[in-house]
Amino acid sequence: MKIIGKWALLIIAALSLPVKAALDIVITEGVDAARPIAVVPFVWQGTGPVPSQISDVVASDLTRSGTFKPLDALGLPQSGISTLAEFAPQKWTGINAEAAVVGAIKPYGPDQYLVTFDLIDLLKAQLAGQAPLNKQDLLLDSRQTVITAAQFRQYGHRISDVVYEKLTGIRGAFLTRIAYVVVNHAEKAPYRLMIADYDGYNEHMLLRSPEPLMSPAWSPDGRRLAYVSFENRKAEIFVQDIFTQARTKVSSFPGINGAPSFSPDGKTLAVTLSKDGQSEIYTIDIATKTTRRITNHYAIDTEPSWFPDGKSLLITSERGGRPQLYKVELDSGKLTRLTFDGEWNLGGSITPDGRTLIFVNRTNGKFNIARMDLETRFMQVLTTTRLDESPSVAPNGTMVIYGTTHQGRQVLAAVSTDGRFKARLPAGQGEVKSPSWSPFL
């Protein structure tokens, strides 16, 4: 049985507020086609009520992934089991699920709990039929760790990460965060830069302002956010440490200071500046504030983002007459147009594996999130929502969070990169925009 250390939980726990969901996730499409899985309620081996039901977090995570569909816990053939040893393969015959998650929670010390879980291969059990079976061969994973009461939800995300990776081969992204801007004009300082767990829980306010805030972008180590603030009645770019709250003004040139994007090594920002007349792409060394001009054209160049190797930028440019996406090689300055389908293509980013372009496509006047395979150049429109903008890709490349409009309000939404799973993330109060998905934490 493996021991999961607490280090992966400390980053999240440091920012946690009382547990609540600031953004309610409303799944709109894709659950029925997902892969069935059994998440058995974890057994509480203490007295009094269970402090928190981790299995609920796991089931919700797997549902929101768009890949799995947890079965109704009340209809499972076994309940009250916590280990593979208690698993009875014959009772699961005919259950349409590929795996089962079982576990237990028991007191370990003052404000400490031991959490154990096993991931069981149901497909192998069913394929064996009545043949002799070594139950140990069904064990896909088994782990335990000691957590505090404040870490229940985060450890549930960690279990989900393990389950997701074991069954798909792709690293889970449940122990990640999102940054976004909330706007509520009923308040004196209506603009708030917020951080929350990927599912909207544990919301934390980083900054509040009477003037607009926009374009948050994570550093690759997950410790800092770059963003644009108009707090001094003009656009300026700041970098802020999300733990210490210390922040540095990186760019305050005349005109546009916008669209910051961290380089893969975290040392440089790619930005949009108009200090020399036109809207152009620059890089800024964060430590020295040294700028380097990357583009030089009379047309608008904006919205830079980095290719994973750090050697090129993806930009939106109107040099062809309409907004399209281009690749700019930093050493040579070579410019390559990437998009041709539709009327406009803008606001792009590259998936972490460097293979896929995620962007906003306008066709017939409709703005939707789209993807394009960089090798085959095949493009697929992923969404059917309205006025989509600001797509941000999960660090495992499987999901995209973006801004859209629903019933006249700006909300966040999510779509899987295959377009099959869709969800909305409306806020309880105000409007939400400019999402940015964190790296792995």
UniProtKB/Swiss-Prot annotation:
InterPro entries recorded: 6-blade_b-propeller_TolB-like, PD40, Tol-Pal_TolB, TolB_N
Location within or outside the cell: Periplasm
Signal peptide: 1-21
Pfam families: PD40, TolB_N
Any single biological process term in GO: protein import
Any one of the GO CC terms: periplasmic space
Keywords assigned: Cell cycle, Cell division, Periplasm, Signal
Domain of life: Bacteria
Gene3D superfamilies given in the database record: TolB, C-terminal domain, TolB, N-terminal domain
Self-association state and partner proteins as the record states: The Tol-Pal system is composed of five core proteins: the inner membrane proteins TolA, TolQ and TolR, the periplasmic protein TolB and the outer membrane protein Pal. They form a network linking the inner and outer membranes and the peptidoglycan layer.
Function per UniProt: Part of the Tol-Pal system, which plays a role in outer membrane invagination during cell division and is important for maintaining outer membrane integrity.
Similarity comment: family membership: Belongs to the TolB family.
NCBIfam families, per database record: propeller_TolB
Protein name listed in UniProt: Tol-Pal system protein TolB
Organism: Shewanella amazonensis (strain ATCC BAA-1098 / SB2B)
